[in-house]
Amino acid sequence: MTFRLRLRFVWQTWRMNDVTRYPAINAVLTEWADGVKRMLGKKIVGLYLSGSLAYGDFVPERSDIDLQAVTRGALTEDELRSVEQLHRQMERRCPQWADRIECSYVPLELMRELTPPATSRPWWGFGTFYAEAPAGNEWIINHYLLSKHGIALEGPDFNELIPPIDIHAVRQASARDLFQEWVPKIEDRAWLANSHYQSYLVLNLCRILHTVIQGQPSSKKVAGQWAKATYPQWRNLIEEAEQWTYGSEMKRQADAAAFLRFAVERVNETELL
């Protein structure tokens, strides 16, 4: 029994050290997975890596680390405090990833919901822990992408936890996300003045357009390449958004807002909603 446990520990350690081609990120993933398992034990159903690290187009200078934990039941107040403390310790020890780790903790019973559940779930992002974060249109989009590209760090394949997702529903969710999440940003001058947000907006608009028009949810890299070829008038703006890194400036506020209006026109033409 002790020998089998030792083999399992060695195999898991080797696997975590080989999840991505970035040793520093593998160390972060190991610390998170070990910490969550230590705190929650058998309450953990699965731990998953998603986002650009799973798609294969991660850019260290600007990309985030996207994680999801699936739990048996909701977390208690003590567990919530422990999870928050874990994330704060991780970002203090790895300051290069401060404000660049996003992680949700979803009870297993909510995973069967195709539409955003009314019940909120804990979420860590931008250096802040939200014990009750509501799910939005990103719910079905993220689950679809996890079903196609997600990497299980612990537990079963992600597809075993969710019902099949229809691509039409993903296209509709992406269109709704455009109008509910992004269109209001046109009037938010302070938000648009932020270089990071300008880049983030432009690249997300490329993904929305690619998903809605092509019916193919994809990475920002793939969507950006498609958008530059399909809408060459926006090539320069998209390339600048792709090249942006933390610490650099992107002074394209007016152009980003114009691209947002352009995206609205293209999505409206589909009559998807």
Predicted segments, located by residue:
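Extended, basic/helix-rich recognition subdomains
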Residues: 180-240
